[in-house]
Amino acid sequence: MAIVKSKPTSPGRRFVVKVVNHDLHKGEPYAPLLDKKSKSGGRNNTGRITTRHVGGGHKQHYRIVDFRRNKDGIPATVERIEYDPNRTAYIALVVYADGERRYIIAPKGLSAGDKIESGNAAAIKVGNTLPVRNIPLGSVIHCVELKPGKGAQLARSAGASAQLVAKDGAYVTLRLRSGEMRKVLSDCRATLGEVSNTEHNLRSLGKAGAKRWLGIRPTVRGVAMNPVDHPHGGGEGRTSGGRHPVSPWGIPTKGYKTRKNKRTDNMIVRRRDKK
């Protein structure tokens, strides 16, 4: 991968920083693994905005990605690495020995022609998927399940990973990139290695229009609104908002804890690090 900066022929070109990977497939995606993806504009079935700052963007097809990796004992060969507009990580098209093709999240270092497999007896090798109880301590893993057989839920985005730090009976302990220490059932599966496109955080979109291509609409400050629209709105001239920062619905923001999931509190050994 390469970090590419453009000549400053315009303000938008001056600030853009691209991450270019010349090993990505340049043709069309594999059609049988595509699905339609309709845009909601952030609205629900009644037409009300339920997610702000969403709308527009380039049309996309959804790539059906295999997060379960449940074809045990059947080796697969990586056919190509592809760009996926629906996620920050790259995806790999793999063809199994029985002829079936699937998309998987591509780990760092995986390339066309590599062999991968999944199952209890899979080798300790980047791209292989096996239960975490069979993975050595200290290993770097990604695409971790939280419930056996449900499919990967943790460490799926570009450059993400977790480290296996302890095993204790039916559970193992993982250290996540946020600093959180979390217990996971030892029957849950994970894939060895870290997720590809590790330089994704170095990119700069360069201009507002690039954000619109991604389907992200502008974020307006509350102090720039009218009182009817936001608790910080109104006032003569510029104001500070007059109170501690809140959302449009009056909920404190900037550090206010919103986690409401007691059911899994006992699985978190240590909360994430404060930034």
Curated annotation (Swiss-Prot):
GO molecular function ontology, one term from the record: transferase activity
SMART domains per the UniProt record, alphabetical: Ribosomal_L2 (SM01383), Ribosomal_L2_C (SM01382)
Gene Ontology biological process terms from the UniProt entry: cytoplasmic translation
Alphabetized UniProt keyword annotations: Ribonucleoprotein, Ribosomal protein, RNA-binding, rRNA-binding
Ranges where the record places region Disordered: 28-55, 224-258
Domain of life: Bacteria
Family annotation (PROSITE patterns): RIBOSOMAL_L2
GO CC, any one term: large ribosomal subunit
Compositionally biased residues, Basic and acidic residues: 28-38
Entry similarity comment: Belongs to the universal ribosomal protein uL2 family.
Functional note: One of the primary rRNA binding proteins. Required for association of the 30S and 50S subunits to form the 70S ribosome, for tRNA binding and peptide bond formation. It has been suggested to have peptidyltransferase activity; this is somewhat controversial. Makes several contacts with the 16S rRNA in the 70S ribosome.
UniProt-listed NCBIfam families: rplB_bact
Subunit structure and binding partners: Part of the 50S ribosomal subunit. Forms a bridge to the 30S subunit in the 70S ribosome.
Protein name as annotated: Large ribosomal subunit protein uL2
Organism name: Cellvibrio japonicus (strain Ueda107)
Organismal lineage: Bacteria, Pseudomonadati, Pseudomonadota, Gammaproteobacteria, Cellvibrionales
Gene this chain is encoded by: rplB
